[in-house]
Amino acid sequence: MGWTAVLLLCCTLPAQGLIRIPLQRFSSVRTELRSAELLESFLRDHQPDVFARKYSQCFPPRLHTLRLGWTSEKLYNYMDAQYYGEIGLGTPQQNFTVVFDTGSADLWIPSSYCVSEACTRHRKFKAFKSSTYTQVGKVISIQYGTGHMLGIMAKDVLKVGDLVVTDQEFGESVYEPGFTFVLGQFDGILGLGYPSLAEEVDSPVFDTLMAQKKVTQPIFSFYLSRKKSSANPEGELLLGGVDEALYTGPIHWVPVTQKNFWQIKIDSIKVQGTSTFCTTGCQAIVDTGTSLIGGPTGDIILLQQLIGASPTSMGEFVVDCVRVTSLPQITFTLNGVKYPLPPESYVRKEVISGQEICFSGFQAMEMSSRQGPLWILGDVFISEFYTVFDRGQDRVGFAPARQTGEWGS
């Protein structure tokens, strides 16, 4: 049976037999920097390109590359990542917390030989304890701001959920710079982008799962809850299918326009029903590795004005928490289907020094694609819509996500 036939069948099958990876929601690095009173200095040193740095491989506004005679790669920016899950590497298994990131395609974790401050605060892979470990012999350099990460490539047994694959290539970092990894509550990154996005691994993790026939269908899906509940998952990555209990209505599909990031076309973006942005269409990357929605600077500044957001000294935008429920709805139209974002989705509430502050979930970035202006649809969008990534038919699907309190309805 071909992938197409299997995919048609999968949309009507229950979720039994599929592989679930629970995702936990933690404070982002941005929040940790703010709590440590370090955010202002970090943004001063790294703005305006904290967003651009992640996507510079395919959409370079400027080049951030360090070459040391070995393979060179850009280090992705994860200061807004919030949802993490567990994987296991080696024999016997060593566990790590990772960002499952559709905006990258490589897998890396800290090495036991790493002595950077960031590594001392995270679990480190002990290669000498794994009987199935193989060193590839390639040194990697990953650029980040004014510093760089160094590492080596290796292969070992990888466990994701209940799935086990052999000879998965991954990077072991031996030097990690910057506050992003010191304060991050994740050990490493597991990329779920297309193979063309990977600069280091020959076969990204999901490609290995498909090649070794570990998933019945070439799809994976994300559920990210906006609300914490002891009875229901904060988030879930499902490998090989979808879980109908986590969304309502049908899944609507949007074709991938460029196979590296999960890039799709936006028809339009409207604020309270008025067509304001992308009136002639634009492009978007669906990215589980950031919590924000990013867009062109001019559009984002206008959007902040339309929702009544005011700038802070650190380049962020805040709204009056009392007014959140009266803020306008923002609607993204994708492949003819409207996806409305209520203010409860695009406003992030944080308590700082005992005071509740409401931050806008939109952030400016300066990049474009050959097909038009570029937006980033991060967790602000994905938490509102159950999101399915289909490698078999190169498309992304969306359906309204069930929120806490809607279960069993």
Positions of predicted regions on the chain:
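Flexible, small-/acidic-enriched active-site or ligand-binding loops
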Residues: 232-281
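Short strand-coil-strand connectors
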Residues: 88-94, 145, 159-166, 218, ...
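Aspartic protease catalytic domain
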Residues: 2-36, 40-45, 92, 100, ...
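Disordered propeptide/prodomain
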Residues: 1-98, 106-109, 113-150, 211, ...
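Aspartyl protease active-site motif detector
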Residues: 83-128, 158, 189-193, 239, ...
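Extended, H/D-rich, highly charged conserved domains that either
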Residues: 194, 214-240
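Aspartic protease
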Residues: 112-164, 302-339, 343
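Short, solvent-exposed loop/turn segments enriched in Ser/Thr/Gly
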Residues: 151-155, 186, 279
